[in-house]
A protein has these predicted regions:
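Periplasmic OmpA-like peptidoglycan-binding domain that tethers envelope proteins to the cell wall
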Residues: 44, 49-57, 84-172, 176
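Periplasmic peptidoglycan-binding/tethering modules of Gram-negative envelope proteins
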Residues: 1-81, 165-186
Length: 186
């Protein structure tokens, strides 16, 4: 029952995000399994740069308030363990250079979020967000593939995702239940 409740919260949260993006006429693709959104680095940044473009600032100004407002809603906030902003690069170039670039890009998005957060979050919501927000660079790890080939444009991205408090426990329980079911069927 506890597993169903937590899984239900995640499903409800993803549904609430979709609904709010639709109501704000924002074309945002949400990963059905994780609730993550991928922001196109080609819009956010010039190639090989970590300073936000004007178009990127405009995009973030529309998307981040909606995403954060839903996550900070009291019905979900208690379950929220982390809000993560993750930068990724394509597979060309040097790993360490790309690690620095991806970290700088993730930090640029996080910094932008806090520049304006008090205009759409209450003081308590802002405090909670500060306790939960992380910013990470992943270099060229986890590239995006299209038709078996690395999609360089899609691989250059910043993802915004959340993690629920009991998610790790649920994943462990799922593994145990799957192993138990397999053992019983043998």
């Amino acid at each position: 029952k506890k597993i169903e409740q937590i899984i239900g919260v995640k499903a409800d949260l993803i549904a609430a995000l979709k609904k709010q993006f639709d109501e704000h006429n924002l074309n945002v693709v949400i990963d059905e399994a994780s609730g993550a959104i991928a922001l196109d680095s080609n819009v956010l940044f010039a190639y090989n740069e970590s300073e936000l473009t004007e178009e990127g600032i405009a995009m973030l100004g529309e998307i981040l308030p909606v995403y954060c407002k839903v996550l900070m809603d009291p019905q979900y906030e208690d379950y929220l363990a982390e809000l993560s902003i993750d930068g990724y690069t394509d597979t060309s170039g040097d790993y360490v250079y790309n690690l620095e670039l991806s970290q700088a890009r993730a930090l640029a998005v996080a910094s932008y979020l806090f520049q304006d957060a008090d205009s759409f979050l209450t003081a308590d919501e802002l405090t909670s967000l500060k306790e939960k927000l992380t910013s990470n660079g992943h270099s060229m790890s986890n590239p995006v593939y299209s038709d078996g080939e690395v999609n360089m444009d899609a691989s250059r991205r910043v993802e915004v995702r959340f993690r629920l408090k009991d998610e790790e426990m649920i994943n462990e329980l799922k593994d145990v239940l799957a192993k138990t079911a397999t053992a019983q069927s043998e």
